[in-house]
Amino acid sequence: MSSRGKWSWLHSPITGGILLIIAATTALFWANLAPSLYHHAWHDALFSVSSGFSATIYSISLHQIVNEFLMAIFFFFIGLEMKRELLDDDLSTLKKAALPLFSALGGVVLPASIYYFFNAGTDTVNGWGIPMATDIAFALGVLAMVGSRVPLSLKIFLSALAIGDDLMAVLVIAIFYTEQIFVNELLVGFLGLIVLAVANKMGVRNRLVYYSIGLIIVWISFLASGVHATIAGVAVAFTIPSRREISMGNYLITAKGLLSGLDKERHNKADVLTKNAISSLREIRDLSYQASNPLQLKEEALHPISALFIVPLFALGNAGVIVDDSMLAELTNPIVLGIAAGLIIGKPLGIFLFAKLLTLLKLGQLPEGVTWRHIIGTGFLAGMGFTMSLFISDLAFSEPEQKIVAKVAVLLASIISGIVGYLILISAPVIKKDNKLNS
């Protein structure tokens, strides 16, 4: 078995989904069995900076490190996914991209409107962005559990829909959940982005250039500007090169020549290679890098870090809410009603209605093998807001009580949406290539 095959489970959406469930469950047990320990572990300052004998001028907690630094890396990964999807054949033209992106718009507008309906005129109306989010890791994980009963084109549709959803969520965070903007710091951040864009245009592929400028200049500047630092992650991702240095045809021609030169090493059983062999192998390695897409290489490298470390750690630090008898009374809270109805009803209904409208207008069509039942089931999976919804709830509310109520609503709605979506898809008739239905 190749090393790639041996570790392929690290890239499975099921693995990420299982870890996310374990982390969220652990957070709930931890917060309810040892609430004081949970709070101190995540919110006490890990270190602080003081000026002489004056009070602390800066401190940072584990919760802040996760939400402001590690989540910026997660959003960088999301940005890489967005750019790759937009360049991919499945979304490379307006006609192909229209259905999932327009459906994503419906899955944003209707949930936000439902939340606004329940909370209009109150101090909780600012949470309208919470039910518009989709947790792509959870959604794809559940879809993977359905297996071959759904066509591959549905996974592509869900991925594209989630990318559109994430793009709108990022814009909402940048525009509506930024309280105060310091222009000078923001301009420095934009200057860093311009430098990276120029480097991309000039063909610079050195990852150190993009990581150092992205972290030292862009991320710190955005953090200081008042714009949430996660936006810097997405912005930097769009400056990452996506062009190969050599074509696959030229790669194959050159690689075959180098491999033929290694033919004389066929019978060399010694562990020590000849200088010729070392040189040829090094050239093949460099050639393989030149034939690769830098954007895809970074995305592949970050996927396990994001799915298996950052997102579960975020869930561990943000999903811990104390569940007691008082929570039952909160089930009629406008925050709970708005989030739950938005995710459970608004998401699938908005996605279905906007997709239906586009097909009726002949501006788009369902992917091959996908039925309207699949679209509805996928809509429910998109209602699993979890990570993104928890993240936005932390930005939307300043009162701890409101944050707790919102988190409970997100957890309940995500579980219900996931179960309903799974049941709809697992019970859907299988459509074979001859278009005959099979139960």
Swiss-Prot record:
It is found in: Cell inner membrane. The chain crosses the membrane at residues 14-34, 60-80, 98-118, 127-147, 156-176, 179-199, 213-233, 303-323, 335-355, 375-395, 408-428. One of its GO terms (cellular component) is plasma membrane. GO terms for molecular function: sodium:proton antiporter activity. It holds the Pfam family Na_H_antiport_1. Its main location: membrane. It is a multi-pass membrane protein. It catalyses: Na(+)(in) + 2 H(+)(out) = Na(+)(out) + 2 H(+)(in). Disulfide bonds: none annotated. GO terms for biological process: regulation of pH. Keywords: Antiport, Cell inner membrane, Cell membrane, Ion transport, Membrane, Sodium, Sodium transport, Transmembrane, Transmembrane helix, Transport. HAMAP family: NhaA. Belongs to the NhaA Na(+)/H(+) (TC 2.A.33) antiporter family. Na(+)/H(+) antiporter that extrudes sodium in exchange for external protons. NCBIfam families: NhaA. This is Na(+)/H(+) antiporter NhaA 1. It comes from Psychromonas ingrahamii (strain DSM 17664 / CCUG 51855 / 37).
